[in-house]
């Protein structure tokens, strides 16, 4: 299954491409949303993401290029720069902002929403800045991989999710091949942000491919090489109720989250 991203906007008008969380792919358990943001035009990102709430999941922001500033209601503050990751566990509730620290130049990256299991949706919120130099880089014949979470070729990523998952950023040279082990039963996908990938089908730039649930995933780069993220996770197989910035298990829990936010007791 190959899914194209759709152009939309979020925050205070940040233009982006939504891949998971779109009509074509509402979710891929445990992944709730995948956005790619990427532009040289400051008008597309300068308004940023002013303070807004979350409850019930984790956000993983991977910045390929650019500078953003994070602040949240727990007192955490961080700076996203080229190649860095921001890992935030919303848990029972957090209010945060993500605002650009640049007025010109390229901003590019991804935000992934990872669902929390039912028994962890109300854990205390947490935040972790992961600078680029703390993300392991693995060199292999024909390419490189950055390991954000999980294990790959002996390297372990610094991300610590509350459910089983891995997250790699991979660059493959022209027509080189790679086999990526995926645990049977996990949901996995790859998203191509440069070049073309072949995986029993052609996956072009700005497209996501849902991978098989059994065996290793074999990937071959096109003639110009390819850059892509590969992500896999253990499905939670639990009810999912969504309400804007909140993701819980029932509509009643969503209404409670809205009421808590309205009454100033979300955090």
Predicted regions located by residue number:
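Jelly-roll (double-stranded beta-helix
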Residues: 1-267
């Amino acid at each position: 299954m190959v899914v194209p991203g759709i152009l939309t906007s979020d925050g205070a008008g940040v233009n982006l491409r939504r891949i998971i969380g779109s009509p074509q792919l509402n979710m891929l358990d445990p992944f709730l949303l995948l956005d790619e943001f990427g532009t040289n035009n400051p008008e597309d990102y300068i308004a940023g993401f002013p303070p807004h709430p979350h409850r019930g999941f984790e956000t993983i922001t991977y910045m390929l290029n650019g500078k953003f500033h994070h602040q949240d209601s727990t007192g955490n503050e961080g700076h996203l720069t080229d190649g860095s990751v921001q890992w935030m566990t919303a848990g029972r509730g957090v209010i945060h902002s993500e605002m650009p620290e640049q007025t010109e130049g390229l901003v590019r990256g991804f935000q992934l929403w990872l669902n929390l299991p039912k028994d962890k949706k109300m854990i205390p919120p947490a935040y972790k800045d992961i600078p680029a130099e703390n993300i392991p880089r693995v060199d292999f014949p024909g390419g490189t991989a950055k390991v954000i979470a999980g294990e790959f070729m002996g390297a372990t990523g610094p991300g610590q999710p509350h459910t089983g998952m891995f997250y790699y950023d991979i660059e493959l040279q022209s027509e080189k091949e790679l086999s990526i082990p995926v645990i049977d039963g996990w949901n996995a996908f790859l998203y191509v942000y440069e070049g073309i990938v072949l995986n029993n089908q052609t996956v072009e730039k700005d497209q996501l491919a849902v991978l098989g649930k059994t065996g290793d995933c074999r990937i071959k780069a096109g003639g110009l090489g390819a850059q892509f993220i590969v992500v896999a996770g253990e499905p939670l197989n639990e009810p999912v109720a969504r309400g804007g910035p909140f993701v819980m298990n029932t509509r009643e829990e969503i209404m409670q989250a809205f009421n808590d936010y309205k009454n100033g007791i979300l955090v």
